[in-house]
Amino acid sequence: MEAFPTEYFLGTAVRLLENVKYRDSNYTREERVENLQYAYNKAAAHFAQERQQQILKVSPKRLEASLRTIVGMVVYSWAKVSKELMADLSIHYTYTLILDDSEDDPHPQMLTYFDDLQSGNPQKHPWWMLVNEHFPNVLRHFGPFCSLNLIRSTLDFFEGCWIEQYNFHGFPGSFDYPGFLRRMNGLGHCVGGSLWPKENFNEQEHFLEITSAIAQMENWMVWVNDLMSFYKEFDDPRDQTSLVKNYVVSEGITLNQALEKLTQDTLQSSEQMMVVFSQKDPKIMDTIECFMHGYITWHLCDNRYRLKEIYDRTKDIQTEDAMKFRKFYEQAFKVGAIEATEWAYPTVVERLEQRKAEEQAERDEQAALANPEKAQVAQVVLA
């Protein structure tokens, strides 16, 4: 196993942060906590429902971790949308994270996908069953064009996760494969399309800007995610089909060369994003910039990406990149490091326990009504 290229990673991260002029001022601390609480409470209540528990069969602990990650991503990044949309997107993207972590073979339950879709029958695949039920709650916030992007991108994501089940890097010489898979499972169009709710934007009036933003966001957000995920995925056996490692196999290049390719693509995409929209409607640019800065803050602060380990590693490194990275990290940490205990409650486990207690109390009450003499004796004994 090669050693993680710490110095190179620091230089890459610093260049990215400088390119986008990173300065997350999306919220006051109180606003951030309030939005986190609102989105989490609605999403946790959704996933604690008996139907979701029975169909998903995901452990409450894993579900809790997924919820906290996704609620953070949505609240930090979608800073310009309503709290209600934040909550609905949090539910949708939690479903996608659950699928991304799944190891179940979808083939048997997808045999009648289109037939069921055409005839209006429920889907056989449990994930599609639940996602389709929730989709109207998401789509009600958008016009038809943005809605179509969300639907299509979610379908692509499912197929991308299906492909990843095979841990296939692409055949040597198949240079198009890594980008094909990453665009498919990156949710870029879903993310790009969900920045423009009809409450804030008339999609007909801003059609060209929205279309261009979706096109640019498709690559930017997945490449930034790949850069920020590179450390956590470096030695994780579950993440061996990352974009960087697929470049290594398909193009026959070294890991450092593949990382450099990703770095250059990400930096170029960041520059394009800033240049293309800097002269457009200020409201469009503000939405994009707030998303970019919030998305980076989320990566730097969320435990899933383990970037605090990189920060800790650099404390004894006095290079320019190391010092700049520490400064950026501390800036992000100051605004984005909020303990889940401040907003993620009641937890999914607590909600499930509460529901069980209420169901037991209801059963006891029904039993007492069915057998009043026995209940009266019990009351006398208790007295």
UniProtKB/Swiss-Prot annotation:
Gene3D superfamilies to which the protein is assigned, alphabetical = Farnesyl Diphosphate Synthase
UniProt keyword Lyase present: yes
Protein name, entry field: Trichodiene synthase
Signal peptide, first to last residue: none
Query: Where does this protein act, in terms of pathway?
Result: Sesquiterpene biosynthesis; trichothecene biosynthesis
Q: Name one Pfam family in it.
A: TRI5
Q: Which GO terms describe its molecular function?
A: trichodiene synthase activity
Gene responsible for this protein: TRI5
Q: What does this protein do?
A: TS is a member of the terpene cyclase group of enzymes. It catalyzes the isomerization and cyclization of farnesyl pyro-phosphate to form trichodiene, the first cyclic intermediate in the biosynthetic pathway for trichothecenes. It serves to branch trichothecene biosynthesis from the isoprenoid pathway.
Q: Where are the transmembrane segments?
A: none
Keywords on this record?
Lyase
Question: One GO biological process from the UniProt record?
Answer: sesquiterpenoid biosynthetic process
Q: What is its EC number?
A: 4.2.3.6
